[in-house]
Swiss-Prot record:
Coiled coil: none annotated. Belongs to the peptidase M20A family. The gene is ygeY. Keywords: Cobalt, Hydrolase, Metal-binding, Metalloprotease, Protease, Zinc. SUPFAM superfamilies: Bacterial exopeptidase dimerisation domain, Zn-dependent exopeptidases. One of its GO terms (biological process) is L-arginine biosynthetic process. This is Uncharacterized protein YgeY. Its cofactor is Zn(2+); Co(2+). GO terms for molecular function: acetylornithine deacetylase activity; metal ion binding; metallopeptidase activity. The keyword Nucleotide-binding does not apply. Pfam families: M20_dimer, Peptidase_M20. Zn(2+) 1 binds at H81, D114, E174.
Length: 403
């Protein structure tokens, strides 16, 4: 039987640690940490975990930082990816994205919402658990994972497949505006290649223009995007052309190849095989003898480890009556005296591997808001850090009590 959950004390402690979480988050933001360059921020997180009293902290061969609280037989994990995207056009920022900014309510900087704020709240949730003696028949694993922005879920493929770590469920701390999120659409990265024959541009009839051959394909892709699958909860599948490439001997020549990249979002019931086949079936694709394929990812992590995978990120969701939803709803109601909003992400998370590939339930609750992700002047809310730290401290006991 789980311990009684001291919700009031947990929330008071979370409020007490607002300044510490703010400082720690700003420290992380000040360290540029794009995918495959996370070494410094990983070591900064390890330092903070050790400072607040985690029982064990280690960095795995891929470069993920793993912190443990407790020694119980049942394992629950909470995850934050700690890499960020770049800053884009610096002229679009009103403040330095790494120096950041701070007001009484806000913290600004690259990674504040997406998603180093989640890490700040998790680390101090660990301290709250230690302060209040909330350890029970569980072990809490807090992960700071790498390369998510490059290849979402690859870090957890490694953790599960190579390290043999398999929690009973995982809380994703991606931004949810302090709502409970229970699913997301999947995605895949598709490429279409068309071949042509070059010749001098003064007599184009002698060649076979690959760009012209791609034109009808683009039109049919746009039409296909209007008739993709639909799910009542996750919404519709989508398709957009995100990149276009060509080769040509010169600007005075016919292009001899053309390729496009496609960002395909998969709703419930859609498969990677079906997504490729529906493109291969397009008349313009067949007429051009185009090759339709899926991208692969094999970029080394900051430690030099290569863990290749195909660029397919499965759709996932848990049902409203799932134990993970109940555990988070009960924790939220105990802390705040009202029911949380239960919804879904628009973007993708590490859940694509944790649940999408490996069937380990995932549930989301995080500080910050989705529209802040990858945007200039990114920010998060200090109150969100407090709310999430309290939730993360209460969730393990709420889970044990829910069963």
């Amino acid at each position: 039987m789980a311990k009684n959950i001291p919700f009031k004390l947990i929330l008071e402690k979370a409020k007490d640690y607002q300044a510490d979480m703010t400082r720690f988050l700003r420290d992380m933001v000040a360290i540029p940490s794009e995918s495959c360059d996370e070494k410094r921020v990983v070591h900064r997180i390890k330092e903070e975990m050790e400072k607040v009293g985690f029982d064990k902290v280690e960095i795995d061969p891929m470069g993920n930082v793993l912190g443990y609280i407790g020694h119980g037989p049942r394992l629950v994990a909470m995850d934050a990816h700690i890499d960020t995207v770049g800053i884009g056009n610096i002229k679009n920022w009103d403040f330095d994205p790494y120096e950041g900014m701070e007001t009484d309510e806000l913290i600004g900087g690259r990674g504040t919402s997406d998603q180093e704020g989640g890490m700040a709240s998790m680390v101090y949730a660990g301290k709250i658990i230690k302060d209040l003696g909330l350890e029970d028949e569980y072990t809490l694993l807090v992960t700071g994972t790498v390369q998510e922005e490059d290849c979402d879920g690859l870090c957890w493929q490694y953790i599960i497949e190579q390290s043999g770590i398999r929690p009973e469920f995982v809380v994703s701390t991606e931004p949810t505006d302090c709502q409970v999120y229970r699913g997301q659409r999947g995605r895949m990265e598709i490429r279409i290649d068309v071949q042509g024959v070059s010749c001098h541009g003064s007599a184009p009839e002698r060649g076979d223009n690959a760009i012209f051959k791609m034109g009808p394909i683009l039109g049919e892709l746009q039409e296909l995007s209007q008739r993709l699958g639909y799910d009542e909860f996750l919404g519709k599948g989508t398709l957009t052309v995100s990149e276009i490439f060509f080769t040509s001997p010169s600007r005075c020549a016919v292009a001899d190849s053309c390729a496009v990249s496609i960002d395909r979002r998969l709703t419930w019931g859609e498969t990677w095989e079906g997504a490729l086949d529906e493109i291969r079936a397009l008349p313009a694709v067949q007429k051009a003898n185009a090759v339709v394929s899926m991208y692969n990812y094999d970029r080394p992590s900051w430690t030099g480890l290569v863990y290749p995978t195909e660029c397919y990120f499965p759709t996932w969701k848990v049902e409203e009556d799932h134990f993970t939803v109940k555990a988070l709803v009960n924790a939220y109601e105990g802390l705040f005296g009202k029911a949380p909003v239960v919804d879904k992400w628009t973007f993708s998370t590490n859940g694509v591997s944790i649940m999408g590939r490996h069937g380990i339930p995932v549930i989301g609750f995080g500080p910050g808001k989705e529209p802040e992700a990858h945007a200039p002047n990114e920010k998060t809310w200090k109150s969100h850090l407090v709310t999430c730290a309290a939730m993360y401290a209460a969730i393990p006991l709420s889970w044990l009590a829910t069963e």
